[in-house]
């Protein structure tokens, strides 16, 4: 364990060790045997997946107020189609001056290339990371929006500044990971205010 003292453990996400550790480190740790690694494969794999999920949730939690806001949230609107809600959310971002006039066209260009729907959620975004400010506009619908061949109940329109390229991938994966959980999705469908949505996100992240 003395060898670890010279390392920057703060940059570690997960630490595997073959000896007991007597100090607390700011990362997930797991002790494994150096022998019969194949028999420990499932435990190692589960540990990696759980650590990755905790990391994604941590990034979503720490970035929540940086990218989500009340003025970019709409719930149970009368809009029912993909085009209606996309145009509306694009307008919200432009009114806040987080995107320029060409943003909407690039969102549709990306959408026409292949759908951004996954099950009952959709995460549309521009073909370019040229947003003035990285932000996420959210639409929630109990009835759902017709999204190509899917019915989606949650739409996250991502506007990404190129300076946040890494954050884009992390947020993308975090949103899919969290709202792919059917029980969380069902709760989200019932959100009528930004505050309810925020509480839902935080409460489920804290359970991880």
Walk through the language-model features, giving the residues of each:
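Cytosolic covalent-transfer regions centered on His/Cys nucleophiles
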Residues: 5-10, 14-208
């Amino acid at each position: 364990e003395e060898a670890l003292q010279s390392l920057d453990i703060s940059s570690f996400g997960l630490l595997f060790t073959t000896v007991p550790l007597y100090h607390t480190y700011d990362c997930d740790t797991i002790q494994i045997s150096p022998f019969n690694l194949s028999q420990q494969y499932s435990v190692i794999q589960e540990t990696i997946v759980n650590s990755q999920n905790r990391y994604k949730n941590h990034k979503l939690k720490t970035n929540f107020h940086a990218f989500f806001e009340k003025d970019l949230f709409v719930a149970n609107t009368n809009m029912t189609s993909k085009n209606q809600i996309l145009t509306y959310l694009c307008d919200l971002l432009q009114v806040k001056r987080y995107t320029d006039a060409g943003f909407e066209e690039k969102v549709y260009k990306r959408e026409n290339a292949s759908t951004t729907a996954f099950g009952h959620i959709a995460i549309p975004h521009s073909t370019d990371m040229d947003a003035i400010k990285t932000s996420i506009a959210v639409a929630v619908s109990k009835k759902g929006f017709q999204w190509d061949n899917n019915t989606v109940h949650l739409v996250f329109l991502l506007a990404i500044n190129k300076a946040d390229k890494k954050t884009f991938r992390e947020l993308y994966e975090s949103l899919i990971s969290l709202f792919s959980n059917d029980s969380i999705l069902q709760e989200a469908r019932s959100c009528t205010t930004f505050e309810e949505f925020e509480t839902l996100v935080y409460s489920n992240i804290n359970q991880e």
